[in-house]
Design a protein with these regions (language model features):
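Conserved ATP-binding/catalytic segment of the ANL
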Residues: 369-379, 386-394, 398-459, 610
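Gly/Ser/Thr-rich phosphate-binding loop
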Residues: 261-265, 277-365, 379, 387-389
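Conserved AMP-binding/adenylation subdomain of ANL enzymes
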Residues: 193-210, 220-262, 277-282
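AMP-binding/adenylate-forming catalytic core of the ANL superfamily
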Residues: 120, 257, 264, 403, ...
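Conserved pre-ATP/AMP-binding loop-to-beta segment of ANL
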Residues: 23-26, 145-146, 153-174, 180-181, ...
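AMP-binding/adenylate-forming catalytic domain of the ANL superfamily
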Residues: 8, 479-480, 487, 492, ...
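Conserved AMP-binding/adenylate-forming core of the ANL superfamily
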Residues: 24-82, 98-109, 158-163, 184-191
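Regions immediately C-terminal to embedded phosphopantetheine-bearing carrier domains
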Residues: 566-694
Length: 698
């Protein structure tokens, strides 16, 4: 491991040094998702692949040009990212659209238009679908593809190491901004090194640690915390794809157990998912006693999620003191504050009514989880957003951060950069847009100044959702739709309020409008609104200048003062009464799987998966169960494109008729008591990371 006197100035220098000093040591292990073997890369292997991709890039691009990365999570993604760093090309992490539908392509098209990449790095399998997108791009932005899986490793000899300095931009992280107006955070090589130092210190990473990750590589937490941190610190890393985890959450815990994972984590929903989905029969064969840093971030941390997880997995020897809270955002590279290893996450009970008025008083009603302390060489303030006054302890204000991890603004967006990255007292401060307070140096996050919604760790922007409703539901008045966060049964979800004209109210049933709104949002974002309010004309709260007041809309909905004439879930979505036809065995079998996963009593042929309460996590689990039970090749994309029971069953029937078998699932090897690791096993632990989300609560 490198000490303070050996710190590299770039991640390129870090990997090159390891490739020279310990070339055969395992750098990464990717777990196989079928009956094939996983992929392991030594430092020599990764360096060779990075140099070959860099050489190919240098033949087509100049220092500072951009390259978009479009891969599933896996070895190609990693090699391509380092290839960009090696070439001095600015990497733009992204992900292939979930389907060919317009909604799923919009974000990628917006990123391409904003970043103006010289190349798109991908694999041969994705070449044709990506080339079809050129019809939606201008000639200047037409995709030029480089399939990295077809490169000859010998081209690495042509690599010419560029003069990359710490202030040069390493990559653009598109994690903030709406679909229509994306904002690419400019993260420099120096930012990366500074933040990796913080993560190593904060987590207390040592030579005996093993990092296990399922987080997406296109997301800052998965990329910087899951992939780059183990390479920077020289510790083993085990990676699996997010899909592999979501299909069966127990796989995450099995990997920690099998490979001796000590550092791993994810958003709050990952812990809830394990509590809900892992069978009791699995608890005794999983050993989580070595898991020392179970970090939680990327969305609000809920005490009940942690308590349920700790209670259930006590049988697997999980220690609740391993929970570790972290807060951060892409504009600060990733990590801003964190707890203390082995100390758990302190909770603070406060008066709910006082908190709603941004005051802190101990009492009942709300429980806030401590997000740790600021890190060395970095500073934090709580500031009154209106006056700019710095606030003392127990005063709620906007969280500001400063230090060498703070990014270099937004790509070619001076206006947004000036609003978010401000000068004060001779240094640059990041206005996070999050609300919180300090108590004895510890940070508590209470909410957001921004209107952004965070659902299952993913950022959803209200402007995007509002545009979707307005374009797909003509009866909703243009400019009179508001999307906002709601909390139902302890989980954050989407709320929609839409003004409906008097004439439409008379001619179109309220239930039909509600169903149309929920279906439009569900198909675009794989998450149906938990609340829909149909409003009378003029009822939507606005400022004197005509701007939507989304927070006021939510508050009025909560206190009952919103002028609505129909409300979901006061109205329930209409479901057809008849069950699937008895003579259609396939429809019935798939219907039973839907009912079990969605927790509904019945499902009809034309019922829509996402309107029944499904989301992207449930979709992954349904696809996996159908694939395994019927032995058919099936992909998540096929449920997104055919979201009704009837349409999805027809898709499955076509796959069966074509005789496309599923890849055989990985054989499960029974394990008894876990044995101590030998020296060879410890070397084997040189492993990896993987898989989704953005700005607010990393």
């Amino acid at each position: 491991m490198m000490d303070a006197f050996e710190l590299p100035t770039t991640l390129v220098q870090a990997l090159r040094r390891r490739a020279v000093q310990e070339p055969e040591r395992l750098a990464l292990r990717f777990l196989a998702e079928d009956d094939g073997e996983g992929v392991v890369l030594s430092y020599r292997d990764l360096d060779l692949r990075a140099r070959s991709i860099a050489a190919a890039l240098q033949a087509h691009a100049q220092l500072g040009d951009r390259a978009v990365l479009l891969f599933p999570s896996g070895p190609d993604y990693v090699a391509a990212f380092f290839g960009c760093l090696y070439a001095g090309v600015i990497a733009v992490p992204a992900y292939p659209p979930e389907s060919a539908r317009r909604h799923h392509q919009e974000r990628l098209l917006s990123i391409i238009a904003d970043a103006e990449p010289r190349l798109v790095l991908t694999t041969a399998d994705l070449r044709e679908p990506l080339l079809q997108m050129n019809a939606q791009l201008s000639a200047a932005n037409a995709l030029q593809l480089l399939c990295v899986d077809q490169l000859d490793p010998a081209v690495a000899e042509a690599w010419d190491e560029p003069q990359v300095r710490p202030e040069h931009i390493a990559f653009l992280q598109y994690t903030s901004g709406s679909t229509a107006l994306p904002k690419g955070v400019q993260v420099s090589h120096g930012n990366l090194v500074a933040n990796e130092v913080l993560i190593r210190r904060g987590f207390g990473i040592g030579a005996d640690d093993v990092i296990v990750s399922w987080l997406p590589l296109y997301h800052d937490m998965g990329l910087i915390g899951g992939l780059l941190q183990p390479i920077f610190s020289g510790v083993p890393c085990v990676l699996m794809s997010p899909r592999y985890f979501l299909e069966r959450p127990v796989r995450w815990l099995e990997a920690i157990s099998q490979y001796g994972g000590t550092v791993s984590g994810g958003p709050d929903f990952a812990y809830r998912l394990c509590s809900e989905r892992v069978a009791e029969s699995a608890l005794q064969r999983i050993d989580l006693s070595g898991w020392r840093v179970a970090f939680s971030g990327s969305e609000p941390i809920r005490q009940d999620s942690l308590e349920r997880f700790a209670e259930k997995f006590a049988a697997s020897r999980f220690d609740a003191s391993s929970f570790f809270a972290c807060y951060g955002l892409a504009e600060a590279t990733l990590f801003v504050t964190g707890g203390q290893r082995g100390q758990g996450i302190p909770a603070l009970a406060v008066d709910g009514e006082a908190l709603a008025r941004n005051r802190i008083a101990e009492g009942e009603g709300s429980v806030l989880m401590c997000c740790g302390r600021r890190q060395p060489e970095h500073a934090g303030l709580i500031v009154d957003a209106a006056s700019g006054e710095v606030l003392g302890d127990d005063n709620v204000g906007e969280i500001w951060a400063a230090g060498p991890s703070i990014a270099h603004g937004y790509w070619r967006n001076l206006e947004a950069s000036a609003k978010t990255f401000v000068e004060r007292d001779g240094r640059t401060w990041l206005r996070t847009g999050d609300l919180g307070f300090l108590r004895d140096g510890e940070l508590f996050v209470t909410g957001r100044l921004k209107d952004m919604l965070i659902v299952r760790g993913h950022n959803l922007y209200p402007q995007d959702i509002e545009r979707t409703v307005e374009s797909e539901v003509p009866s909703a008045r243009k400019g009179r739709v508001a999307a906002f966060a709601v909390t139902v049964d302890g989980e954050e979800g989407i709320g929609i309020a839409a003004e409906i004209g008097r004439g439409v109210q008379k001619s179109v049933p309220a239930q039909e409008l509600i169903d149309s709104i929920r279906q439009a949002v569900a198909e675009a974002y794989q998450e149906a609104p938990k609340v829909v309010a149909l409003l009378n004309p003029g009822a939507l709260p606005k400022t004197s200048s005509g701007k939507l007041q989304r927070s006021a809309c939510r508050l009025r909905l909560e206190d009952g003062s919103l002028d609505s004439y129909a409300l979901f879930p006061g109205l329930q979505a209409v479901q057809e009464a008849q069950p699937p036809a008895g003579d259609d065995e396939l429809l019935a079998r798939i219907g039973e799987i839907w009912k079990a996963r969605l927790g509904v009593a019945q499902v009809a042929p034309r019922d829509h998966f996402f309107l029944l309460g499904g989301n992207s996590i449930g979709a992954a689990q349904v696809v996996a169960q159908v694939r395994d039970s019927l032995g058919v090749a099936l992909d998540l994309r096929q449920l997104f494109e055919a979201p009704t029971l009837q349409a999805f069953s027809a898709t499955v029937a076509r796959q069966l008729a074509a005789g496309l078998p599923a890849e055989a699932p990985m054989a499960h090897l029974p394990r008894g008591v876990d044995l101590p690791q030998s020296a060879a096993q410890q070397r084997l632990w040189l492993t990896w990371q993987i898989d989704p989300q953005s700005a607010a609560y990393n």
